[in-house]
Design a protein with these regions (language model features):
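Active-site cores that bind ATP or allylic diphosphates and position pyrophosphate for catalysis
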Residues: 1-385
């Protein structure tokens, strides 16, 4: 049975064609704010129900509850603030109850917002609670500290879609739910990734697939830290893996356009909620899910799920997988009795170093077809000037 949306109803904040025309005619009169790409894609995520039950950016009550209790003000589990930051100068003529136009970086209006509340926030308090650190080297902390002085909350209505370079990999929740039903999948396991797949990922996915009907591989495309794989590399690598090593009727590959927050445990629950909205009944939570550096304990992202028995999606906790030459394949500590001399630990960092040196990782770490797909790219990793 496809999972019900979080909160019971799939949000739709996309304007009808008639309403779009009306709004477009009104936009010229409204205060306009230009938002960066990561905010713009989250406007779309709200509108298309990926962030259900949110209908807009958080007002202070929901924001405070999420920050302190990891729940919305109605007690529904929700672990990460979804906020719109603004400069006081941008909204100097705006008061609560007004409408404003949200423009993307191309200066094209993408949505209107009904302003419910404008409020101040404490960036340090936000960062400490969300990321468990104030270290400026943490990418989420660094990004938070650069945000603007005020937050503005209220419902949004989408009037224009963004440019989407990954159109052929894009499915909205309303579409995945139809697709899963057409496939007659009653149980669907979601997999979040920001990496190209190695054998450890494949092992975990196939282990989950053995007792569910379908696997939903949902790579995150959007803002990530330098050194992470580029979006197009991840998609090419997964396409190669699925083509050569997965039963074609058991897997759906589609992107999630949003930013990585690197919020570890909180983000693991957030990722599970989003996949529930796509229709997943189960969600794979690996070691150090959504982690970065050493800010979180290895299995902290699994332990947090104990606080959410009412989440409505079943987390699947997996231990680290490795290649055992004695077993002759990929295994985990739970099923392999052999000493370390037989084990090849799969390090994502080590694989990235090999690829940077244009060296093909060995088949005990990564499928050759996947490695070849990655090495076709001259620069497979993100860099920011």
């Amino acid at each position: 049975m496809v999972a019900p949306p979080h909160g019971g109803k799939l949000v739709n904040r996309v304007a009808s064609e008639k309403r779009r025309k009306e709004i477009r005619d009104e936009v010229g009169e409204l205060t306009k704010i230009v938002v960066p790409k990561d905010i713009a894609v989250d406007v779309e995520n709200i509108a298309h129900g990926i962030f259900s039950p949110l209908e807009g950016f958080m007002t202070q009550e929901d924001y405070t509850h999420v920050l302190n209790d990891m729940r919305l003000s109605n007690d529904l589990p929700w672990t990460l603030p979804v906020v719109l930051d603004v400069d006081p100068k941008e909204i100097k003529d705006v008061k609560e109850g007004d409408e404003i136009a949200i423009l993307d970086e191309r200066k094209i209006p993408i949505a209107i917002m009904e302003v419910e509340e404008i409020f101040k926030w404490n960036k340090k308090d936000h960062a400490k609670k969300v990321f468990k650190t104030l270290n400026p080297k943490h990418p989420g902390v660094a990004k938070t500290m650069k945000m603007k002085e005020l937050l503005i909350g209220g419902k949004i209505t989408l009037i224009n879609e963004l440019e989407n370079p990954f159109h052929r990999y894009t499915l909205r929740p309303v579409e995945t739910r139809i697709l899963f039903r057409e496939k007659k999948w009653r149980t669907i396991v979601g997999f979040q990734t920001r990496n190209a797949p190695h054998l450890g990922h494949e092992y975990v996915q196939k282990a989950a697939l053995t007792f569910t009907d379908g696997l939903f591989i949902n790579p995150l495309v959007g803002w990530k830290k330098p050194g992470d794989y580029k979006d197009e590399v991840i998609l090419e690598a997964y396409s190669a893996l699925i083509k050569h090593y997965y039963p074609k009727d058991a897997v759906v590959l589609a992107v999630l356009r949003t930013s990585m927050r690197y919020a570890g445990p909180r983000e693991a629950v957030f990722h599970a909620i989003l996949r529930k909205n796509f229709g997943c009944t189960h969600f794979i939570v690996g070691r150090d899910h959504a982690g970065v550096g050493n800010y979180y304990k290895p299995y902290e992202a699994q332990e947090i799920f104990k606080e959410f028995p009412d989440l409505g999606v079943t987390p699947l906790f997996v231990k680290e997988a490795f290649y055992c030459s004695k077993c002759g394949g990929m295994v985990s500590e739970k099923i392999c009795p052999h000493p370390d001399q037989y084990k090849v630990r799969i390090s994502g960092t080590k694989i990235r170093e090999m690829i940077m040196q244009r060296v093909k990782p060995p088949p005990t770490m990564m499928r050759p077809e996947v490695a070849e797909a990655i090495l076709k790219f001259e620069k497979p990793f993100i860099t920011y000037s």
